[in-house]
């Protein structure tokens, strides 16, 4: 590991000289990429320096205790050695984690899709609750979000909603939210007070730039129509809604929230690029295709990654066996105690 870290230190020094002279780069994109690499290596070198310092302090402590004759002072040194050994172990674990090459998608913005699955109106209402949960979380991180497409129910729920979240490390934080979310609660329409179980699916896609996904104009069929609201009633007198069909893959995206056809088409293209990228990436990586299928599935209640139990104020993530009895806070966006263990488990599985 030390040999690898010394090689990376040489790369970091070279990169440090390069980023100080932006004129050497052929494009803004290449400069951004090098800055991202420099930031990663800087974090790694900072931890490596901490590791080396702790290692030297531990060596000095071992030498000191051999030369010391005072029993009380020896006890003090032994305690210091135990503290330094623990710090060295922690630093070593951090280095192993940091040595995992960063995912190029880590810093991407996302397109998030939430759909009501099993449970009818109650599933649609919970889909709306999840949307609010994620937007509260985004606000707490000072991220921005924008609704791209939504299909509402007459009770105020969402059959489905598609929205973007943009900011620092968005995809890296929220990528593990993909999957089936199960809710157990008494619906407001339930007179007998029985607990119902419903399911909602969440898909998280990295938002791709136009230059990153090749979609030819002739491969996209554009249909325009009048926007519709809950129950199917017409809510617009002009053909502002847009449906894009990607002919090679059959992917269909509909956007109708904006009054402008041009704006709806632009939003639909953002979603289409991300869906096409996700499909192509799944084909290239069979393992990822299997993971995505197991996460998203059909929305059936038997396929779940997380359960929200309202009567017990409990939320359980079944992948990392995390159970919290503060569902009320989670639904207001307090997700860090769930998201952080997922990120840690993912990194540790690669080490």
Curated annotation (Swiss-Prot):
Q: Which SUPFAM superfamilies match?
A: Release factor
Q: Where in the cell is it found?
A: Cytoplasm
Q: Can you summarize the PTM annotation of this record?
A: Methylated by PrmC. Methylation increases the termination efficiency of RF1.
Please give the chief subcellular localization of this protein.
cytoplasm
Q: Which residues carry this modification: N5-methylglutamine?
A: 233
Q: What's the protein called, per UniProt?
A: Peptide chain release factor 1
Query: Among the entry's GO cellular component annotations, what is one?
Result: cytoplasm
Q: Which GO terms describe its molecular function?
A: translation release factor activity, codon specific
General function of this protein: Peptide chain release factor 1 directs the termination of translation in response to the peptide chain termination codons UAG and UAA.
Sorted UniProt keywords: Cytoplasm, Methylation, Protein biosynthesis
Q: Where are the transmembrane segments?
A: none
Q: Please give the family membership noted in the entry.
A: Belongs to the prokaryotic/mitochondrial release factor family.
């Amino acid at each position: 590991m030390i040999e690898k870290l010394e090689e990376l230190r040489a790369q970091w020094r070279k990169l440090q000289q390069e980023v100080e002279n932006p004129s050497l780069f052929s494009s803004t994109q290449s400069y951004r990429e090098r800055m991202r690499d420099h930031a990663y290596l800087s974090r790694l070198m900072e931890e490596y320096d901490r590791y080396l310092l702790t290692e030297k302090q531990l060596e000095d402590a071992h030498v000191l205790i051999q030369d010391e004759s005072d029993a009380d002072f020896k006890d003090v040194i032994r305690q210091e050695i135990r503290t330094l050994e623990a710090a060295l172990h922690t630093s070593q674990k951090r280095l192993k984690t940091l040595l995992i090459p960063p995912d190029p998608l880590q810093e991407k913005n996302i397109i998030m899709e939430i759909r009501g699955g099993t449970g009818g109106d109650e599933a649609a209402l919970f889909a709306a609750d999840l949307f609010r949960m994620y937007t509260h979380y985004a606000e707490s991180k000072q991220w921005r979000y924008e609704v791209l497409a939504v299909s509402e129910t007459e009770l105020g729920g969402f059959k489905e909603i598609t929205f973007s979240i943009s900011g620092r490390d968005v995809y890296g934080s929220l990528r593990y939210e993909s999957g089936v979310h199960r809710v157990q609660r008494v619906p407001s329409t339930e007179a007998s007070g029985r607990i119902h179980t419903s399911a909602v699916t969440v898909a998280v896609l990295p938002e791709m730039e136009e230059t990153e996904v090749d979609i030819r104009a002739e491969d996209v069929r554009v249909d325009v129509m009048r926007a519709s609201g809950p129950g199917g009633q017409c809510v617009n007198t002009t053909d502002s809604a847009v449906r894009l069909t990607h002919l090679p893959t059959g992917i269909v995206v509909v956007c109708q929230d904006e009054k402008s056809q041009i704006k709806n088409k632009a939003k639909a293209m953002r979603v289409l690029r991300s869906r096409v990228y996700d499909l192509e990436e799944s084909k290239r990586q069979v393992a990822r295709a299997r993971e995505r299928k197991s996460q998203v599935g059909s929305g059936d209640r038997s396929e779940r990654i997380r359960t929200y139990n309202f009567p017990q104020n409990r939320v359980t993530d079944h992948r990392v066996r995390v159970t919290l009895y503060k569902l009320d806070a989670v639904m207001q966006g307090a997700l860090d105690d769930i998201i952080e263990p997922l990120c840690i488990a993912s990194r540790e599985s690669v080490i």
